[in-house]
């Protein structure tokens, strides 16, 4: 599923470091099916809705979504700024409890005096994802759990959370928002 000679190009071979990507072996229809949203008719990707807690705990995003949901439920809502981000006090508190492999809070504090939510990408991503998944919503300058979020917090309802978050992240959100580049429309 690549242009003839593409993989023979020395620049491409150097960039790939000798690895031939699996997608190059796909036919056009197979590649297209993988790019489409999972559904009853498109079974190229199947999202497992009944994972065990041990399997869920392996996902930092799912664990952090549960932490965010619990904090919002336990505190009567998480305080938001006028722009809709979590307040600095909430960000400081959440930085101590979220799981963020490879994220170095000390390094961030070294270059910034104050930390806003967008500065902590693992937290910012999870908050936006939880809102896009309709697990939380804003109400009177607070982030509160929705009925769906409260149901998922019930001990026996964690199973579908990872599938829901994966589905929303890859088929409902614009992940380009997180790349740091503003979209420039042609003039």
Model segments located where?
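Short, amphipathic alpha-helical interface elements at domain boundaries
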Residues: 2-125, 148-151
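Accessory beta->alpha helical hairpin/"wing" motif in late/C-terminal subdomains of nucleic-acid enzymes
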Residues: 124-126, 133, 137-184
